[in-house]
Amino acid sequence: MPRVKRGVQARARHKKVLKQAKGYYGARSRVYRVAFQAVIKAGQYAYRDRRAKKRQFRQLWIARINAAARQNGLSYSRFINGLKKASIEIDRKILADIAVFDKAAFAVLVEKAKGAL
């Protein structure tokens, strides 16, 4: 069997990794060995943070709802409990949006929640 030289495949693989590492600082964008490690680590961070992003946004929404609810004289937990008892099903993302951009509508929701408690 003839000897197979893998220069073409190696070159293609190196080019692919270096293309992914474009914009990285120093050797991370120029040296294959370092770039490969940087790309792998970047992928791990991206995977982890796609999941963390969901938690962080939920935390942000809850903080905004809590602040707006307290301005209207109700804590977050009592507000959410009141909404559930009043059969108002609005998710936290929309509630946070209403709290930030439409304070009057949020005040109405707080009153309904208070009434249901």
Curated annotation (Swiss-Prot):
PANTHER family the UniProt entry points to: 39S RIBOSOMAL PROTEIN L20 (PTHR10986)
Record has Ribosomal protein as a keyword: yes
Annotated GO CC locations: ribonucleoprotein complex; ribosome
Name this protein carries in UniProt: Large ribosomal subunit protein bL20
HAMAP family the record matches: Ribosomal_bL20
GO molecular function terms listed in the Swiss-Prot or TrEMBL record: rRNA binding; structural constituent of ribosome
Keyword set, alphabetical order: Ribonucleoprotein, Ribosomal protein, RNA-binding, rRNA-binding
A single GO BP: ribosomal large subunit assembly
Family to which the UniProt record says this protein belongs: Belongs to the bacterial ribosomal protein bL20 family.
Domain of life where this protein originates: Bacteria
Functional summary from the UniProt entry: Binds directly to 23S ribosomal RNA and is necessary for the in vitro assembly process of the 50S ribosomal subunit. It is not involved in the protein synthesizing functions of that subunit.
